[in-house]
Amino acid sequence: MPYPGLEVVVQYWLYSLVDDWHSTQRSVAIPGAGTVRMPGIHQHHEGDWEAVTVGMSADRPLFVDWSAHCAGEWRPFAGATLVADPGGERTHPVSWVALGSHANLPTPVTARPRWWNCDPRVATFVHQRVQAVIGAVAIAALGSRLDDALGILDRAGSGTPQAFPLALVNRTTWPMTFPGIWGGRERMEVGPAGRALGWSPPTPTLQPLWRNPLTTIFGDASRSRGR
């Protein structure tokens, strides 16, 4: 853990009614196969929890972590984009929200989504279904460019940051006392074919980021340190 002076961890949990992400469908020129229209991909489930975590010493903030589903990104506090209350200092880190997936991000980017690596079954199913649609020859020709050709992207706009009302909660406060998941099965659809893969997320108090925030943020190889 890179912050020996850490004393307090504050988390801001954000809830969305539904996760409803679509790929950016493209036509791609493939050697030996001509121009191929790639199948669209749709990922969706009910209920979506994301979190921003701020670690502080006795006198200053130290780092910020954006959950971005299962594989987030943390930065030293000085590396976060900060905004101010009217007439105040810049002390509030900004979280940009990706369209559809609601992945919370430290910058307004268009990039490969981190949830893509959350469950190996997702990538396996998608690649198998894509091969069934465009054929093994086209898959081999695309090689490492396949995911880019499929338009698997999170897209976060660069609008003006907004503040929202906060409610102070702990593990004994509703809705953190709900002992279950926040919806039904998660589905992945590739073209006309779909499959249930996984479930909607559980209440934050049942998630590793709440129960063991430092181990989750700094001990998980899938999470990354930004600038």
Task: Tell me what each language-model feature is.
Residues 3-11, 17-227:
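Domain-length functional cores that host ligand/cofactor binding and catalytic or interaction surfaces
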